[in-house]
């Protein structure tokens, strides 16, 4: 049986220019393709997760193309071959995918690299579909001698004879796909990294991910993000007081998306803020693995933002005992938001902050990492800022890390800027 495999992601320039607050592809035919899969495969959710991951590597067109190639293949394979949501893969699935990449079927291999999308020449549909999927595109390309490539441009031939992935190529597959699942775990979208458990990792020549960015904002970037959210709230309070509250709540308490959007068995309420006998505030959550925990709440958050949002909602300044008011609601007042909706709201803040930095002529190096920021960066950023001032054990408890070493290895080191400045002006002579 021939399985239709279509490109899911744009060229580099079109990819970076799209509106990432929209939870759909910028190309309608891609949306139609994703919607053609059974609902339980969560094709659109998988696509959005992959899109955000790829955004981390969009600064360099060549790096982006490399990462897009591997993640796109994995998503297409999980939907078409495995028929399983990409967020639910296990070790055996990862091993099966790696074997698949060594010798893909003929229908997945093309003789030359082709354009992913083409201008729609059909005047009756061009308004709705300005570009369409190139049906000749394939996820894999067989290396063809240069002198024969011209003859293949208009060919429909699919080539798999002699297709072999090199050890270096398989190392890229392993490294990039493993990095993708580490990202999914951070974003609370997957429970495990199936590639981390693969047997005989050394055969894939896996190397550290040198293209990864530090997933924390700089102090300057955070100032812009917070100021932008406050400006959005001032300009459109009915729409963005909630956005500001979500942003500052996640940042203040190192929260994951699920801590604020909720889980199937738990939805956060204002009553989850509780004050102890000494007047300290705690936020009670049901986290990963259905583990209950409490997180210390800083005074600045309570007096500056929690009370502000509650007054905006017409509530008493502070949460009451066993209060059932949902922590966040839709604009119409319905309880709760989906994690996808929360991500979109935060993405709008990041994008607007980046636009402000551009408008104010900030240097490129000051903005670069903000282009890749996602909701989980708030947790990392806050912990990075707070680590120099907090006991490691206390920070571990509020981050809900099971292992103290994880907290120490991740946050108890200098910020890159501080590290650079600590050596920048040290001379090489007269050090006595």
Predicted regions span which residues?
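Conserved tyrosine-mediated DNA breakage-rejoining catalytic core shared by Y-recombinases
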Residues: 262-308, 314
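C-terminal catalytic core of Y-nucleophile DNA break-rejoin enzymes
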Residues: 287-307, 323-350, 372-374
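N-terminal core-binding DNA-recognition domain of tyrosine recombinases/integrases
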Residues: 47-65, 72-212, 232-233
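Basic, Lys/Arg- and aromatic-enriched nucleic-acid-binding interface segment
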Residues: 164-167, 224-257
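C-terminal secondary-structure termini that scaffold catalytic or DNA-interacting sites
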Residues: 425-432
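Catalytic-site neighborhood detector that most strongly recognizes the C-terminal catalytic loop/helix
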Residues: 399-424
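Short pre-functional
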Residues: 178-182, 241-261, 283, 385
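Short, basic (Lys/Arg/His-rich) helix/loop patches that form interaction surfaces
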Residues: 343-397, 404-405
């Amino acid at each position: 049986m021939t399985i239709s495999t279509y490109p899911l992601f744009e060229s580099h320039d079109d990819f970076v220019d799209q509106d990432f607050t929209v939870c759909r592809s910028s190309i309608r035919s891609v949306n139609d393709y994703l919607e053609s899969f059974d609902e339980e495969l969560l094709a659109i959710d998988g696509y959005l997760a992959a899109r955000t991951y790829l955004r981390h590597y969009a600064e360099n067109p060549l790096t982006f193309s490399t990462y897009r190639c591997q993640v796109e293949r994995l998503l297409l394979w999980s939907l078409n071959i495995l028929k399983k949501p990409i967020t639910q893969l296990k070790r055996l699935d990862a091993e099966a995918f790696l074997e698949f990449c060594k010798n893909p079927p003929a229908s997945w291999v093309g003789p030359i690299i082709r354009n992913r999308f083409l201008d729609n020449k059909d005047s009756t549909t061009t308004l709705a579909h300005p570009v369409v999927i190139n049906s000749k595109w394939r996820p894999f390309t067989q290396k063809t001698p240069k002198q024969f490539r011209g003859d293949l441009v208009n060919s429909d031939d699919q080539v798999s004879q002699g297709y072999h992935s090199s050890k270096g190529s398989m190392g890229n597959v392993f490294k990039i796909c493993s990095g993708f699942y580490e990202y999914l775990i951070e974003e609370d979208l997957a429970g495990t990294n199936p590639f981390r458990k693969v047997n005989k990792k050394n055969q894939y020549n896996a190397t550290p991910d040198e293209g990864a960015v530090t997933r924390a904002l700089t102090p300057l970037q955070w100032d812009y993000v917070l100021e932008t959210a406050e400006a959005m709230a001032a300009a459109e309070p009915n729409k963005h007081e909630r956005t500001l509250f979500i942003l500052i709540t996640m940042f203040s308490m190192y929260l994951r998306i699920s801590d604020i959007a909720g889980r199937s068995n738990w939805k956060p309420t204002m009553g989850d803020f509780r004050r102890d006998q000494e007047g300290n505030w705690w936020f009670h959550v049901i986290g990963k693995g259905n583990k209950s925990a409490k997180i210390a709440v800083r005074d600045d958050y309570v007096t500056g933002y929690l009370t502000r949002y509650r007054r905006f909602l017409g509530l008493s300044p502070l949460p009451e005992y066993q209060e059932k008011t949902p922590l966040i609601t839709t604009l119409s007042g319905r309880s709760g938001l989906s994690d996808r909706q929360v991500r979109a709201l935060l993405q709008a803040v990041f994008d607007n902050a980046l636009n402000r930095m551009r408008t104010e002529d900030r240097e490129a190096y000051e903005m670069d990492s903000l282009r890749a920021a996602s909701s989980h960066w708030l947790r990392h950023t806050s912990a990075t800022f707070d680590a120099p001032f907090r006991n490691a054990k206390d920070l571990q408890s509020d981050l809900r890390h099971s292992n103290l070493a994880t907290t120490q290895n991740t946050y108890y080191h200098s910020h890159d800027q501080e590290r650079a400045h600590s050596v920048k002006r040290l001379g090489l002579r007269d050090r006595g």
